[in-house]
Amino acid sequence: MFDVITIGTATRDIFLTSPLFKVLRDPAHLKKIGFKTAEAQCFALGGKIEISKPILTTGGGATNAAVTFSRQGFKTAALIKIGEDQAGKDILDELVREKITTLKLQTNNNGTAHSTILLAPSGERTILVYRGASEDLKLKEIPFDKLKAKWLYISPGRISFETVKKVIDYAAGRKIPVAFNPS
């Protein structure tokens, strides 16, 4: 039995920084074209922009939480869906290094989710997201017989409400507490 099983998103994150990423604040014009905050992160269109060394990490609600729990000494598993690709392999390798059991589901239909985080010098960020396999976790794929834990932690991203509800109902029927992070 695990202390905690995390269920939800797993992504390959790429952090990019550059002094050439500029923040533009122009309420008069930006709100008119759909920028609700009246702010935009900008760089020259068509340019070649120098960046600092890219940082590649594992991200996503389920994997980030699993690493946190494992580092605190909890026996942890992560139920995630990834693609059969290098990014998925990298995520699995990191979870092994962090002593996390993976209840992984792999698919050829979608690649592993990716996020590219553009960090401006001021610390503000813009995130480009490909949700990939993470949002495609289906109810019929969940190995309910393996959800043996003292706690479940659910960070679903865009996993369907029906799937999340069934997992919560399953946990409630077995008196397993659930922590829910709607992402």
Where are these regions (language model features)?
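Glycine-rich phosphate/adenosyl-contacting loop at the front of the ribokinase-like
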Residues: M1-A77
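Cofactor-binding loop segments of dinucleotide-utilizing enzymes, especially the Rossmann-like FAD-
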Residues: I7-T9, K81-E84, T107, L119-P121, ...
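Anion (oxyanion) recognition and catalysis
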Residues: S70, V96, A172-G173
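Conserved beta-alpha-beta core of the PfkB/ribokinase-like small-molecule kinase fold
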Residues: W151-S183
